[in-house]
């Protein structure tokens, strides 16, 4: 049986709507709320020629922006106090909202869509956060 997919996007992206993905499996996330998160995503896009890695934004509530990073890549480093790390570990479980690429996914959408298997570069994200 052929288990490879012909999908042009990662298998963790749902076909429709949105789903919660457990942190630490395919990725972790760094959440930055409000306009700060949007400005950070746009700044990373400029630094990476338009491809910062997958970034999800939320349209309501805190208007959170989720930067999808490699699993466990945020550990053992200081982060700014206004940042939330969504990771897993002993006694810790977190879930990350992931929208489909098309269709009705409100209140979630892709600020930057996933391309291939690349995620947001954790050190670049961290450096950009401290440079604000």
Where do the model's predicted regions map?
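"Short basic amphipathic alpha-helical interaction patches in structured regions
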Residues: 79-85
